[in-house]
Each structure stands twice: as C-alpha cells, then as structure tokens.
Amino acid sequence: MKKQLTLFDSVKKQKLPFEPQEQNKASVYVCGPTVYDDSHLGHARSAIAFDLLHRVLKANNYNVTMTKNFTDIDDKIIKKINETGQTLEEITTKYINAYKNDMETLNILENSQEPKATKNLTSMIEMINDLISKD
C-alpha cells in the first residue's frame, strides 16, 4: 500500500495530496540548464531537489518519467559563439556533457528524457502564436 504523498502547491500556497493523473504513474518536467558555461550551485540545488522527488516517487512504487530540458539556443550561447568562434553544437555538447558529469558526481538519477530546445522550435513557435492569437 502506498503512503499518501503531500506536496506544496505553489499556486494555491498550501500542501495538497499528490493525485497522479494516471494510477501508479508520475510525470515530472524540470526546466534544465542553459548550456553555455559550466554548472553552478543553482544547477546542483535544482537537480538535488528534483532528484529527491524522483526517489520518493520511486520508493512509493510510482513509474516515474522524469524529463529535464536543455536550453541549447539563447542570447548567452550566441554571445559565446561570437566570443570563441566555436559552433553552437560544439559549445552546447561540451556543456551538456559537463553538466551530465557533474550530475553523475552528485549521484543524481538519470532522466527519462532530455529534450533540447533546438529540436522543438517549431512547436514552441506554434504555442507562442496560439497565445498571441488569444490576446
């Protein structure tokens, strides 16, 4: 039997029972780093906090899908391209790999999915256009 999990709802400003949309399944989306430089303490803090949630859900027998994105196109990355002469791919691959090494050192569980912003630009543009049209 599963223990009832209670999570803080930051919108409602109160603790509420965790009620998954699908029984025994939990999907978590975490905004990951913008990969233009080495990881910092803020990246570690976020990773550790969501790793704790991941582990608690698994310990309570949930099938967990943990998704963390990489922002691999951004003004800071473009600035780094201009400063170094490296390609977008060279810079982002270097810092994604460095981030993953740091997370392994911290013993963070692996994510189920790690989408990159550059692979989802079309759907982002469509979403933005939908939001603009609702204005």
Tell me what each language-model feature is.
Residues 2-135:
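N-terminal Rossmann-like or analogous alpha/beta NTP/dinucleotide-binding catalytic cores
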